[in-house]
């Protein structure tokens, strides 16, 4: 089923500003009504937000991104999840567990490669500025 354009693009003729909620397909990402994203570099497609802006977000971790209603997210904002944080409690920062098959580890050991920081939760009516980096925890 196609989403009507007016539900994605709030302004006629503007393909750089979108409402995020209708373009998110990942069930671990929740976005409130009227939250908008603007990517004004005229190169990237703002509808690719969950691919280009939500980073190191792997299902094995079970972490979530929640963004409230009426938020304004500007060009280049990134959300970094747990997998971007290599563990500091090991002999090495090398992420051995992500190569679980090669090293004969159980897939459940993958999450031991990084320090668990938790979900990212953004409240209602929050402005996230140009190229901001929001980290888990």
Each model region followed by its residue ranges:
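Extended, small-residue-rich solenoid/repeat segments and analogous flexible loops
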Residues: 1-29, 96
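Flexible, glycine/small-residue-enriched loop-and-beta-strand segment within the central core
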Residues: 29, 36-136
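A generic short-segment signal for beta-strand/edge and adjacent turn/coil regions
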Residues: 1-7, 33-42
């Amino acid at each position: 089923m196609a989403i009507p354009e007016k539900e994605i693009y709030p302004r006629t003729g503007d393909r750089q500003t979108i409402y995020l909620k209708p373009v998110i397909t990942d069930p671990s990402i929740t976005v409130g009504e009227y939250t908008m994203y603007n990517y004004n570099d005229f190169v990237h497609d703002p509808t690719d937000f969950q691919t280009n802006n939500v980073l190191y977000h792997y299902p094995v971790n079970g972490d979530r991104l929640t963004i409230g209603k009426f938020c304004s997210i500007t060009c280049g904002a990134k959300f970094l999840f747990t997998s971007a944080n290599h563990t500091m409690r090991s002999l090495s920062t090398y992420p051995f567990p992500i190569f679980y098959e090669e090293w004969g580890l159980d897939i459940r050991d993958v999450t031991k490669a990084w320090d668990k920081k938790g979900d990212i939760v953004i409240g209602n009516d929050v402005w996230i500025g140009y190229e901001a980096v929001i980290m888990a925890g």
